[in-house]
Amino acid sequence: MLEVIKAIEAEQVRNDLPEFHVGDTVKVHQKIKEGTRERVQIFEGTVLKRQNGGARETFTVRRVAYNVAVEKTFPVNSPLIEKIQVVRKGKVRRAKLYYLRDRVGKAAKVKERI
């Protein structure tokens, strides 16, 4: 039974997305359907965490706009994600960057990896 589940999950995993890590600044191009129209919405922010693995993998992106913090969680293998662009590579020592939620301004910056 386990082999069947792994085989199905292996078919659903996307290979066309770039490699990105926690701390990276990414642009997520997401398809949004409004009535009959379909458009692409871009959400740019810092990757706070990556969870699970395989077909069920998700990642959370945080961005602060007009002094309001917004966090969105995306499934990596979702067909609604058109593409992911890595804008900046971040250098962090943690797998989950929850401490950034308490930081404001320059204190919430992540060092750049060269």
UniProtKB/Swiss-Prot annotation:
Pfam families the UniProt entry points to: Ribosomal_L19
GO cellular component, one term: cytosolic large ribosomal subunit
A molecular-function term among this protein's GO annotations: structural constituent of ribosome
Domain of life where this protein originates: Bacteria
Coiled coil: none
InterPro entries: Ribosomal_bL19 (IPR001857), Ribosomal_bL19_CS (IPR018257), Ribosomal_bL19_sf (IPR038657), Translation_prot_SH3-like_sf (IPR008991)
TM stretches of this protein: none
Any one GO BP annotation for this protein: translation
Keywords: Ribonucleoprotein, Ribosomal protein
Job description of the protein: This protein is located at the 30S-50S ribosomal subunit interface and may play a role in the structure and function of the aminoacyl-tRNA binding site.
Family as reported in the entry's similarity comment: Belongs to the bacterial ribosomal protein bL19 family.
Protein name per UniProt: Large ribosomal subunit protein bL19
Organism from which the protein derives: Clostridium botulinum (strain Loch Maree / Type A3)
Gene this protein is translated from: rplS
